[in-house]
Regions:
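Non-catalytic N-terminal regions of enzymes
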Residues: 1-141
Length: 141
């Protein structure tokens, strides 16, 4: 079996209505390079907490997208060319993956392009491309 197998993709929308405004990016954001920097974080659950299912994570994500509604929007440009976030409530891209490996079997995870390719799909990597989804969340079971 592959180290990690992606089994599905879903768009998770906010759990309730959100504002539909436009948010300008800060001057510091405007100087940033326009590409995603893949980052993966592993956390061991507390012994007293049951491991959440993909459905639990999707529900939690939909709830958190209400107060953080900009993350359910899309990058765009204003008529004068300034980069901004259009709060569209389109949702965040959620990828679900499975692996037979335990966290310990992954070994010491070192951030690299090769390791990120094991866990992060290639599409959705260009936040300025309006035809691609720009936010990825993963659930591993």
């Amino acid at each position: 079996m592959e180290k990690v197998k992606v089994v599905g993709f879903t768009m998770v929308k906010p759990a309730s209505p959100t504002p539909s405004n436009t948010i300008w990016l800060s001057n510091l954001d405007l100087f940033a390079t326009w590409y995603h920097v893949p980052a993966i974080y592993f956390f061991r659950p507390a012994a007293s907490i049951a491991t959440p299912s993909a459905a639990d994570l999707k529900l939690s994500l939909s709830r958190v997208l209400v107060p953080y509604y900009a993350f359910a929007g899309r990058f765009t440009s204003s008529p004068d060319g300034r980069r901004e976030i259009k709060c569209t409530a389109e949702g965040a891209y959620f990828a679900e993956a499975v692996s037979e490996l335990s966290l310990d079997e992954f070994g010491v995870y070192t951030p690299s392009v090769e390791n990120c390719r094991l866990l992060v799909p290639a599409h959705g990597s260009n936040p300025s491309d309006k035809n691609e989804k720009s936010t990825l969340f993963f659930s591993f079971s």
